[in-house]
Amino acid sequence: MNSLVKIILNIIPRSILTRLSFLLKPLIKIYLRGNKYVDPIDGSSFSKFLPYGYNNVRENALSPSTFSLERHRLLWLYLKNETDFFNKDLKVLHFAPEAAFLEKFKKLKNISYDTIDLNSPLANIKADICDLPLDDESYDFILCNHVLEHVIDDKKAMQELYRVLKKDGIGIFQVPINISNKKTYEDFTITDPKERNKAFGQYDHVRTYGMDFFDRLEEAGFMVEKCEYTSKFLSLIHISEPTRHSD
């Protein structure tokens, strides 16, 4: 099963996987129904979650109902418990919108919700993150999760994120970080998918961020807050994928 998951994730384009997931969801939910694992995003419970991972496959990682991963569920809890996202009037910009959040966010009456991506079939605005067709200071809240590690000129992308965010706005930018490394590792001469997988952990990544990720955000103009939100839950649940947040 784990080997099959790795093959599917590394061969089938993400846009096709997104479409297939919606078709298969009803059958998967029935097959895995139970009460051992609960997805906080929609409250559904299952006998187990699905395995997931491009290289090291994690058991019970992918929710059968929302297709959320650990980081998505953690972000949902952070938004719910630590922000006014669900009750304050906000204009929200969501990059590479995850299926786990899309319909939930669309139904929120308090937010004006725009989704944006260059390739995602779920986005309503098609644009390059390095050249956004958006006005300065036009959004109260920006979500950009696991996008910047795919972008060659991430500093330009960060500048664009800063440009379109209101001065008192909030941005949540998740990326994979190797917390053992002080500096980001990137090598743009590596273009072969297999070599990128070896170097950066995934075939379409162009870098592995180190702890200087936060410095890069500050250089773009952001005031950065580092949040170890997983520590609030480690005594209660097992979270397989460590995540760092800035907002």
Model-derived regions, located:
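Membrane-proximal basic amphipathic "stem/tether" segments
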Residues: 1-38
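Conserved SAM-binding loop
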Residues: 87-192, 211-218
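Cys/His-rich microdomains that often coordinate metals
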Residues: 45-46, 69-70, 99
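Short alpha-helix
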Residues: 203-227
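Single conserved hydrophobic/aromatic residue that forms the stacking wall/gate
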Residues: 237-247
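Short linker/helix segments within small regulatory modules
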Residues: 51-60
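Conserved alpha-helix/loop element of class I SAM-dependent methyltransferases that forms part
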Residues: 68-89
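Short cysteine-rich clusters marking metal-coordination/redox-active sites
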Residues: 39-42, 62-66
